[in-house]
Amino acid sequence: MLSEKEVFKMSEVKIAVTIAPENEISPTFLNELVKYQTSIDIIELRVDQWATPRVDDVANVIDNLYELNLNKKILVTYRTQSQGGKGDLSFDAYIKLLERIIEIDHVDMIDVEFEINRQSHYIENLINQAHKNDVEVILSYHDFQKTPPLAQLKQLYFKMHQMNPDYLKVAVMPYSKEDVLNLLSALSATVDTVPQQVIGIAMSKL
């Protein structure tokens, strides 16, 4: 039986709208955001979609969003190619970009990628820096090839939890109902043992 804590954390849904303007947001699109603001919780800015993500351009777009007074959280994401995005920065350049984005005014949240074989202390330092700037962190992991076994999923969530982000996000590719059930089981078990908000995504139509 699910506890009240599990029901709350597993049923709390946030609606995010994802945008990827090159340098500035058109007035038409800004008007659309205002029009549909009651259906939006988070505005995600995907800067990996840009040919060259420059911090000044990111700051300019965020200022445009902030000036709308929508009272929505602004999430900045640079998704690398290895985790399903278009970003081709080296790991060092990726870390440096996020370090600078964290310092931009009005950034509320940032996505930080987790990879099992990557040196974790760089990620931990980045998360600590974000928290010092009052920026929440979504630590995310994507597997587009498979759904790991239940035990591995639980271990993955636990390792991510140890880095002290605000959200744990795991997205996997299921090929059977059993894969989906394993993700849900890992999600349920993790929700009851960690303080973070926990997210699980099955990237198929199963």
Which residues are covered by each model-predicted region?
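Catalytic alpha/beta core domains of metabolic enzymes, predominantly
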Residues: 114-206
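Active-site beta->alpha loop and helix N-cap motifs at the rims of alpha/beta catalytic domains
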Residues: 3-132, 136-151
